[in-house]
């Protein structure tokens, strides 16, 4: 992009911002993006009744590893939310319009920021957004999966922030969480996330925005995954596949597209390519576009999204942002623009679809059978994370952990140590067996605090020394206050009474509800081998402070 083009792009941004300031955040109409709804296995325009085909591109700016490392925690998020930055999105929208896209896939947004300007500007150009609910640091981990209060709160905050926009097409509850046969046990957690996100939308007076899943194209798992997410009582609303089988100048017959189309014929929910664009040949010719929107595939597939808009180290971009924050068009851009311009899928109206046949019944799909080493996703799902229950742990546990931040390796270290000393079954979640501990839905800090408190009680603690030497470990003075029979935490306390310590005379005091950090020695490797009493050291100042609290001086 030359200086003249950069100048005009800046003018467009300035004009749009002025219009927003003069007319308010609702100055742009959403008439060009009526809500898209699902009927059977198709997307339809809710006003015209015409079938909707996704013709889109992935749109997400990433921070480089070097940038994150040099920043030393200065950034609010590890990702860049372009939809919350009008300078970025308004710069890019003219180029997205040139591409001929009608949908963006965005992988992470900051729910604390306003997205009004960018979402309204996209709507003015007839563009929708498919949005992932997770973000890089808050998501379901395929190797150690959990569906807990922390992740659920993230999902709810995104839903609350974005559901008012009519051009919000749908949410992804996960992306490639199970990516091969070694981690199929992670899929029950994603399915639980779909269930709870849909339930939250339903009970929060939000528009009924669909929630789906984006998977990879692994040969060993793709059939079972496709069945798993539409079987049983909990089902995805749509299903995306990150598809990279077509490279260069492949064909419908040689690429694998023919086989995939046959496999998904009659699939009960909308299915589309949530990513496509193999880059083994550069510039990419994007010849797969003509096949995807052609007669052989458009009756099965609801379109797709090219990966991706921004050029990064992985070399999948169609534009490159230059040193002046301007946009330089790459050869891939011209090829994708040309292919999208030719794409003209022949759809069906909602009325024709309903008249031709009844929508496919999702209930008819049988869940895949468990096969060790092949498919190990149980039909039984984790329960909905219970925020109130988990918050009670913060009130009643004697020892408490606060987040370790950059020292995330401590979680694994401390869990390994504590679970060698106490029974951790109440925090374990097993997607293979369908067994989920009572507190497996709590945050990682709450789960670690529970196990630390067990060890504190196991060693017969009669003071306020928690058995880990770490600045993030606290003795919880709030736990010393006796619970009344009316307390909402009484049931939680009763459920762990047999594994936690009765603080005896401490309950007679009325300490402050603050938390007190203790300088307690972390057991050495030799001490960890002993199951008996562990010696702990504290500074004289801390001993004095504890004595003062016990005497009521700090009331």
Curated annotation (Swiss-Prot):
Entry-linked InterPro entries: Glucanosyltransferase, Glycoside_hydrolase_SF, X8
Lipid modification (GPI-anchor amidated aspartate), residues: 531
Pfam family, one: X8
UniProt: (1,3-beta-D-glucosyl)n 2 binding residues: 176, 217, 222
Keywords carried by this UniProt record: Cell membrane, Cell wall biogenesis/degradation, Disulfide bond, Glycoprotein, GPI-anchor, Lipoprotein, Membrane, Signal, Transferase
Enzyme's top EC category: transferase
EC number from the UniProt entry: 2.4.1.-
Residues that, per the record, bind (1,3-beta-D-glucosyl)n 1: 107, 134-142, 175, 307
Signal peptide residue numbers: 1-24
Top-level taxonomic group: Eukaryota
Catalytic machinery residues: 176 (proton donor), 275 (nucleophile)
A GO CC annotation given for this chain: fungal-type vacuole
Stated name of the protein: 1,3-beta-glucanosyltransferase GAS2
Species annotation: Saccharomyces cerevisiae (strain ATCC 204508 / S288c) (Baker's yeast)
Upper classification of the organism: Eukaryota, Fungi, Dikarya, Ascomycota, Saccharomycotina
